[in-house]
Each structure stands twice: as structure tokens, then as C-alpha cells.
């Protein structure tokens, strides 16, 4: 509902205050083709691409081939109304073009009720970097720096950090200004995120704008000292932003990991089962955002994300160490999760080096990820606590095969 203009209008028509951007801004940025047009007009750099004419269905195949030839391979077919990786297909060879176009359009129609697809150049070895913006109704707009969200599976984010480990100050400033210009182009109000792809050569290109608070907004709150939920409520109340761009600065480094009920060793397929034990870590610089508790059940009816684990530290190295320890200390039994995979990312030399392009998972686990044999001690301890046994008794029963 957060990105549906009809809902925004319905809230206002009911005499309530809508917390978020206008229906116009939601519509303009919710459609990727109209967003591209608006960004081009505003002077914001976009990824080279081609729209496909909707008024010439008989010539669609020929036009698709011509558009793909102009853009060049490899390319992306993207749903105009898409999001979350749905309605998106990579095409590396012309012979796969028509098949992937049909699949992308079909998935887009099923997911969004709109099968419109356009062609976009695929920027390989790129990074997904996004900028948080905040705008009021008095013409004031600021950015709260960037987040890097390059580590993804199925075009969905797994690990996010702020700030990006590779941006220099000039690029950070230019990207922030571009994000503010993008928001101003649609008279944006409230909190929003402008997403960019950062190419190997350092150029960045507009990807899309999310007209809502995103999953990863806590890491921006950590490094900026700003409560984004409070600020968007203040904006909705008609108040001015309490700070200017010059008042904002980056404070330390923050990392967020998304804890999913899924099996990373089996293509990241969603998993189901009970949350028999759910014991998150705690301590200085650790935050958990979740909507589940011990005893709940992960089911196929909902998104597999169980929680967001966030850490904040004075610098990136300290943040990585804190996150690795937090992932190791997180006790979550009863359903398969990606916690082991997240631990391995935090311990990977490529991640420590900041070598985090969007193909990070495919490059570093080309044959897929496999679960390491775990020390049974923490599981025994958790089981003992759950069932009221002494750790020694639980260990004996587990070793003899009579318990778990």
C-alpha cells in the first residue's frame, strides 16, 4: 500500500493525514518509464535504454529486436511497473531475446497487472548505491548520504552498508545532488530513496526511486543521527525540516543484514517451519528490527524475511567484526535460515576489501554456497535452555541419538 497512489488519495479523501509523497509523485516514480523521462528532463544521468511502442503490437517483435540492437548486449528487460526483481530478465544473446521478453512481460502482468517492458543496457561489475532524501512542503530538500546495497540474490538485497566503502567525497556530493534534483523534479515530500548504479569507471546512473521508507533505512539513521520515521511524520504535519544539508555529517559506519527463512545451499529457496528458538544478540551498537517472536512459524504465505540485524561502529572494520559476532551469536532454530551464509559474507576477504559488485555472490560462490559442519555445542545449549535440561544431560542425549 505504501506505493499505491489510489490508497494515498483514499486516505486523504477520508479526511486523514497521508504520511508520504503525493499521489502524483508515487505515480511518476512508480512507473519506471515515466521516471526515466522525468530524470532525463531534470538532467539526472540514466542508464542507456529504449522504450517499446505500445501502439504497434503487430510490429513488437521487430521493434524489440531493433531496440536490443541499439542498446547492445548484454541487456536487461525490465517491467515498467516492476520492483523486487520481478519482471526482470538478463539477455546475453539475441537468440534468447523473444523468450525472455515473453517471460518478463508475463511475470510483470501477474505481479503488477501491467506487462509493459523496456530495454536497458546491463552494466556489469556495477554497484547498487542509493541515496536517502528527505523533503518538506516548504521547498526544502536534503540527502542523508548513501547506502551500498550491492550484495543481492535474485535482484533482492541481502547486505547493506552506509556509507559506501568506495565513494570519494566528490562522487558522494554529486550523487547526493542528483538525488535531490530527482526528488525536486516530482515535487517530492517525505522520505524517499533514489537508487543508482555505479559503473566501474565511476559514472553513476539513475535506476529508480522508491517513494517510501526502505527496509535498509536504519543504517542511514545510524550514520546520520536522524530518526527518519519521526521526520516523515513531521513533514506530513506541515513542519519544516529542522536541519539543512550543512548540518548533516556521517558518523561512523553501519551494516544491515536481512535474515531470511531460506536455504542458501539450495538456490536460496524459501523455507518454512517453526521458530522454535529465536534468541537475537544484544549489546552496544546492535539493533534488531523484526515482526516475529519465538513460537511463530515461517509460512509460504508471506515474504521470507524474518528480521533485520543492524550494527553501528566507529569505522567499517569495527562494524564488520561486530556484525560477524552478532550473526554468530544469533540463535534461531526450527527453520532453515541464511545466518550461516551471512557469517561467511562477513568473514570473506572480498567483502573486507570492499569488492562488492552486484555479482558478489555468483563470483565468490560460483558452485553455490554450502553449509559448514557446525559445532554442536551452541545448539545443545539452546536446546537445554528450551526444554529445561542441564547442558550435560542434553549433550549426552544428543550424542546417543535420543534427543536434539
Question: Predicted segments — roles?
Answer:
Residues 1-194, 198-217:
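N-terminal beta-alpha lobe that positions the nucleotide/phosphoryl donor
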Amino acid at each position: 500500500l505504501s506505493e499505491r497512489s489510489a490508497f494515498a488519495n483514499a486516505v486523504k479523501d477520508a479526511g486523514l493525514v497521508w504520511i508520504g509523497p503525493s499521489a502524483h509523485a508515487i505515480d511518476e516514480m512508480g512507473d519506471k518509464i515515466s521516471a526515466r523521462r522525468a530524470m532525463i528532463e531534470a538532467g539526472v544521468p540514466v542508464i542507456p535504454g529504449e522504450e517499446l511502442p505500445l501502439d504497434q503490437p503487430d510490429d513488437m517483435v521487430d521493434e524489440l529486436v531493433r531496440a536490443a540492437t541499439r542498446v547492445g548486449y548484454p541487456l536487461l528487460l525490465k517491467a515498467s511497473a516492476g520492483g523486487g526483481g520481478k519482471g526482470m530478465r538478463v539477455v546475453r544473446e539475441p537468440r534468447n531475446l523473444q523468450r525472455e521478453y515473453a517471460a518478463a512481460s508475463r511475470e510483470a502482468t501477474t505481479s503488477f497487472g501491467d506487462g509493459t517492458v523496456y530495454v536497458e543496457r546491463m552494466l556489469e561489475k556495477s554497484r547498487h548505491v542509493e541515496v536517502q532524501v528527505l523533503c518538506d512542503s516548504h521547498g526544502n530538500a536534503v540527502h542523508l548520504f548513501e547506502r551500498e546495497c550491492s550484495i543481492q540474490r535474485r535482484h533482492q538485497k541481502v547486505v547493506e552498508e552506509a556509507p559506501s566503502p568506495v565513494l570519494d567525497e566528490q562522487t558522494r556530493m554529486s550523487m547526493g545532488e542528483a538525488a535531490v534534483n530527482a526528488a525536486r523534479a516530482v515535487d517530492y515530500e517525505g522520505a524517499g530513496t533514489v537508487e543508482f548504479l555505479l559503473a566501474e569507471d565511476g559514472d553513476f546512473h539513475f535506476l529508480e526511486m522508491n517513494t517510501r521508507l526502505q527496509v535498509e533505512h536504519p543504517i542511514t539513521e545510524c550514520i546520520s543521527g536522524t530518526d527518519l520515521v519521526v521526520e516523515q511524520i513531521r513533514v506530513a504535519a506541515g513542519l519544516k525540516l529542522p536541519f539543512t544539508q550543512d548540518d548533516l555529517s556521517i558518523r561512523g559506519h553501519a551494516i544491515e543484514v536481512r535474515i531470511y527463512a531460506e536455504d542458501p545451499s539450495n538456490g536460496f529457496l524459501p523455507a518454512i517451519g517453526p521458530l522454535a528458538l529465536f534468541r537475537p544478540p544484544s549489546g552496544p551498537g546492535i539493533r534488531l528490527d523484526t515482526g516475529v517472536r519465538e513460537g511463530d512459524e515461517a509460512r509460504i504465505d508471506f515474504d521470507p524475511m524474518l528480521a533485520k540485524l543492524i550494527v553501528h561502529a566507529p569505522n567499517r572494520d569495527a562494524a564488520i567484526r561486530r556484525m560477524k559476532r552478532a550473526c554468530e551469536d544469533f540463535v534461531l532454530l526450527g527453520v532453515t535460515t541464511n545466518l550461516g551464509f551471512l557469517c561467511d559474507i562477513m568473514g570473506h576477504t572480498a567483502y573486507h576489501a570492499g569488492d562488492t559488485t552486484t555479482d558478489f555472490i555468483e563470483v565468490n560462490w560460483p558452485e553455490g554456497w554450502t553449509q559448514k559442519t557446525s559445532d554442536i555445542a551452541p545448539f545443545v545449549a539452546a536446546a537445554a535452555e528450551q526444554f529445561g535440561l542441564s547442558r550435560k544431560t542434553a549433550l549426552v542425549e544428543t550424542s546417543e541419538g535420543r534427543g536434539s
